[in-house]
Structure formats: structure tokens, C-alpha cells
Amino acid sequence: MILPPFVRATLGRRTEVRGFLVGGHECDPCLVAYDRGYARILHQDSERRRIAEEATLPEASAKRLRRIFGFVEEVGFGDDGAIVLPPMMRRRARIGARALVIGTGGAFEIWSLEVARDHPDPALAEIASFYLDEQHAA
């Protein structure tokens, strides 16, 4: 797949490395991707949440840390933004031939178009439907 220009521009401003980390989203059936600098922010947030939850949900921190730092893969990209999503990540998010990329501030999400279309968030579903309709019209 080809990363949209807004993702390439953001990654280019934030890091010299032509790559990012990709893993499973915390609560949605998609992938979340971010540069190594953002991984430090995620670590700080995880530590804050661990301290807040340690008395009531001690297992939550271990699960979160595995998801954020253990079940991730590094993906590189070229000047044209071409990437190859690792097979495990594609499978995890049920991504086929095309994907939807959604910016979320410090990170971005990569969705299966069909999964996004069926999501309860109406804005996400509308965007996915648009791209699916565009695909069928071509």
C-alpha cells in the first residue's frame, strides 16, 4: 500500500528514519502506527496508567505493555510512501488489498475498508463507504 502524503509529511517532520512501528489498536479492530518518538510518549502514558491501576487492575498494565511494545513490527517506506504491511498485522486487522489510513494526532490507524464501514462510529463508516463506493465506480 502507499502511505498518504499527510502521513509521509508528518513522519518526515518527526524523524529522520524512514519507518514506523505498527501494532494492534487498544480497543478497535485496526492497526495503530507511530514513530519511535511517539513510542516514548506511549511508555510514559503506560507508566502513568500502571500507577493509577495497580491496586484495582494489576494485570491491565502487563497486557497494555505487551500490546504496545511486544506485539509490534517495524515497517519501512520509500520515497513514494510504499509499504508492505507484515502478514501478521494484515491478518490481525483483516486488511485485504486496500486499506484506510486515519490520522489520530500522534499516531495513525490502518483499517480494513470493510471493517471500518461496519464500525459503529458514523464518521469512520462514512469515510470507508466513500472509498469502497469509489473503488466500485472505477
Question: What does each of the following model-derived ranges do?
Answer:
Residues 24-39, 107-116:
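Short, basic amphipathic alpha-helical segments that act as recognition/interaction helices
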Residues 10, 39-42, 116-120:
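Short, charged/polar, Gly/Pro-enriched secondary-structure boundary elements
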Residues 32-69:
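Helix-adjacent hinge/juxtasegments
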Residues 9-26, 88-108:
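Extended intrinsically disordered, low-complexity coil regions enriched in Ser, Thr, Gly, Ala
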Residues 1-3, 7, 33, 81-85, ...:
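Short, structured motif recognition centered on aromatic/hydrophobic residues
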Residues 114-138:
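Short, Lys/Arg-rich amphipathic alpha-helical interaction segments
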Residues 73-96:
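Beta-rich strand-turn-strand
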Residues 1-18, 40, 49-50:
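Extended macromolecule-engaging scaffold surfaces
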